Amino acid sequence: QVTFLATQEKAHAFFQRIHLAVRPVRNAMIVGGGAIGFYLSQELLENHVRVRIVERDPERCNVLAESLPEAQILCEDGSNREFLLSEGLESTEAFVALTNIDEENVLLTLFAKKHSQGKLVTKINRLEFDDILAGLDLGSIVYPKYMTCDYIVQYVRALQNEAGSNIKTLYRILDDRVEALEFTVHEKSAA
């Protein structure tokens, strides 16, 4: 087990040194304006990422537009390929497929992969075909059921850790072989 603690700047330098490309994302296109899309958009906007959300439900578009005034809300069917291209799919730095239909998310990601060099994120609800999906190169696959598990693990670890309230996020990367914790160290914390 290896533990690596660093400031954001030093972490970036470390990843460059080991030749692990880490490009900050400046813009993202999200197809699907549900709860995950909403919260992801909030996080991205807080990190100064330009966000475009494609959502087909007009009522949901209104809610998103009111709740996320900094985001661009596009009320359109996200599976409309010509629309995605006309809205700059080819130049997007991150494409995130978050509809409620797994098959649609897979096809959208494969389409985005063909037309964009951006980072890809695909939401999959059903776990039964994860071995097949792993061979499709869909970028980062997000399983909401696993995310729930990760939040529970994060909470339990926080309870076990006296500085637990400082833990912000638990990440699992490289096929769950690596765990990364993001936490806040306050100025008055003991060194």
What are these regions (language model features)?
Residues Q1-A191:
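Cytosolic regulatory regions of ion transport systems
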